[in-house]
From Swiss-Prot:
Coiled coil: none annotated. [4Fe-4S] cluster binds at residues 60, 64, 67. Binds 1 [4Fe-4S] cluster. The cluster is coordinated with 3 cysteines and an exchangeable S-adenosyl-L-methionine. Binds 1 [2Fe-2S] cluster. The cluster is coordinated with 3 cysteines and 1 arginine. The gene is bioB. [2Fe-2S] cluster binds at residues 104, 135, 195, 267. Belongs to the radical SAM superfamily. Biotin synthase family. This is Biotin synthase. It catalyses: (4R,5S)-dethiobiotin + (sulfur carrier)-SH + 2 reduced [2Fe-2S]-[ferredoxin] + 2 S-adenosyl-L-methionine = (sulfur carrier)-H + biotin + 2 5'-deoxyadenosine + 2 L-methionine + 2 oxidized [2Fe-2S]-[ferredoxin]. Pathway: Cofactor biosynthesis; biotin biosynthesis; biotin from 7,8-diaminononanoate: step 2/2. It comes from Parvibaculum lavamentivorans (strain DS-1 / DSM 13023 / NCIMB 13966). Its EC number is 2.8.1.6. GO terms for molecular function: 2 iron, 2 sulfur cluster binding; 4 iron, 4 sulfur cluster binding; biotin synthase activity; iron ion binding. Its cofactor is [4Fe-4S] cluster; [2Fe-2S] cluster.
């Protein structure tokens, strides 16, 4: 049975042909189907507001072609040390006051050092005590590090697959696609919710975008959170001169992600700064139900808060409460056990 005969049914056996057929539907039909799926599992007028903070910026030894924080590229970005716990918690309080219900923290590492885990876990615990969802993106993790994060009560771990397996070697050479999948499996097996998506506009083909969604939708469990990023080219990086993806194609991708992963929160991540209000509205209609608020996403620009507030008011959108994802796993037991 396909999603088209049972809107919102969970599947893990999507074929490339099925996903391509969805993408190729007449635009109105595709959005209608995505809305049917979306309304089965979520409130259609709710969008989660998240905030992303770079807790350790620059100096990363990886060569991800899109990233301003790679030490392989001259982007003018100065490397910094891991932020102090209290400073991170202070920023989290500001984010909550601004309306965020989810707090994400990113560190420019290949993988964290064991000596950093005490501070990282203290950040998680402090932010959870504020009542917000917590998410970390720290690169690859050892089994012991995953266990530490689970004990701290981390709700989500982000590790994007970035693109299709076929196109991946053209973007990154210092970490394999399989490395990423193994990290996701390690996180999932520890009981932490998975946040994983990708980036479009890196020169990949439409088929590569479908391949990326197929990989995510056919995982043992769908990622509870699926961020879709529109590349914001950074001068000095390998992909600094990339052309933008067509907005309608981007909306189509959001709709296919919603249909293929019906219980996942689909997040409009990087790139909103260059999206019109109309494009964002179509993305919400297609099933996107999370955004990042705040003036910066790690090192790139993001729409100012008042612009988002005006757009939400125009569209009649309300803030989604924390822990509204229907497939989210409760991590509180892990924290108590720790």
């Amino acid at each position: 049975m396909t999603a088209r005969t049972d809107p919102g049914a969970l599947r893990h056996d999507w074929t490339r042909e099925e996903l391509q057929a969805l993408f190729d539907l007449p635009f109105n039909d595709l959005l209608f189907e995505a809305q049917l799926v979306h309304r089965r599992w979520f409130k259609a007028d709710e969008v989660q507001m998240s905030t992303l903070l770079s807790i350790k910026t620059g100096g990363c030894p990886e060569d991800c072609g899109y990233c301003a924080q790679s030490s392989k590229f001259d982007t003018g970005l100065k490397a910094s040390k891991l932020m102090e716990v209290e400073k991170v918690l202070a920023e989290a309080r500001k984010a909550k006051e601004a309306g965020a219900t989810r707090y994400c923290m990113g560190a420019a590492w290949r993988e964290p050092k064991d000596r950093d885990m005490d501070m990282v876990c203290a950040m998680v615990e402090g932010i959870k005590d504020m009542g917000m969802e917590t998410c970390m993106t720290l690169g690859m993790l050892s089994g012991q590090q995953v266990h530490r994060l689970a004990q701290s009560g981390l709700d989500y771990y982000n590790h994007n697959i970035d693109t299709s397996e076929e196109y991946y070697p053209k973007v990154i050479s210092t970490r394999t696609y399989q490395d990423r999948l193994e990290t996701l499996e390690r996180v999932r097996n520890a009981g932490i919710n998975v946040c994983s998506g990708g980036i479009v506009g890196m020169g990949e083909s439409p088929s590569d975008r479908i391949g990326m969604l197929m990989t995510l939708a056919n995982l043992e469990e769908h990622p509870q959170s699926v961020p879709i990023n529109m590349l914001m080219p950074v001068e000095g990086t390998a992909l600094g001169a990339s052309e933008k993806i067509d907005p309608i194609d981007f909306v189509r991708l959001i709709a296919v992600a919603r249909i293929a992963m019906p219980q996942s929160v689909v997040r409009l991540s990087a790139g909103r700064e260059h999206m019109s209000e109309e494009t964002q509205a179509l993305c919400f209609l297609a099933g996107a139900n999370s955004i990042f608020i705040g003036e910066k996403l790690l090192t790139t620009k993001n729409p100012e808060a008042d612009k988002d507030q005006r757009l939400f008011a125009k569209l009649g959108i309300r803030s989604m409460p924390a822990h509204s994802c229907p497939s989210e796993k409760d991590v509180s037991a892990d924290r108590k056990a720790g």
